[in-house]
Each structure stands twice: as structure tokens, then as C-alpha cells.
Amino acid sequence: MKKIVLITGAAGFIGSNLAKNILQKDSVVQVIGIDNLNDYYDVSLKEYRLKELNCWDHFSFYKGNIADRSFLEQIFREWEPEIVVNLSLIHI
């Protein structure tokens, strides 16, 4: 059974590199990435990073905002992650 890791901010610099590192080292880990792809940083750069991550069959991406409770609950119900790494930037 695969261990499931959820990474928020997965399209950002740190989140994408963390996901890539996990994916390269361990094929028994399913990485779930969440990002809202906002334009605070260059969106095309975020899309490029996700394109690289999507090369692994044990990576799944969801576009959405972690402030949306129903969205987040759906992800948790579907995947039941064992580890959550929150690297999202929330604007106040």
C-alpha cells in the first residue's frame, strides 16, 4: 500500500522541488499536489513545474484553494493522506 503525501503550494519553487525529490526517491509514495496557480508569481513557471511533475504516474494534481473547506475535505476523503506539508501562501 502506498504512503500518501499531500503537498500544498505544489507548483511553487519549494513545493515542486519537494515533490520532485520524493517522486524520484520513492515509487511507493503517492504525492498529491494542490495549488491555486494564482498570479502572485509567474503562472507559466508554475505550469512548467507541474508539467515536469506530471511525468510521474504516482503524482496527482488538483487546482484549488486550501481556504475552500469543501475542496480540501474532498481531497482528504479521496486520498486520506498520512503526511501533509503546507507550503501554500495565503494572502490576507
What is each model feature region?
Residues 1-90:
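N-terminal Rossmann-like NAD(P)+-binding domain of SDR-like oxidoreductases, especially those catalyzing
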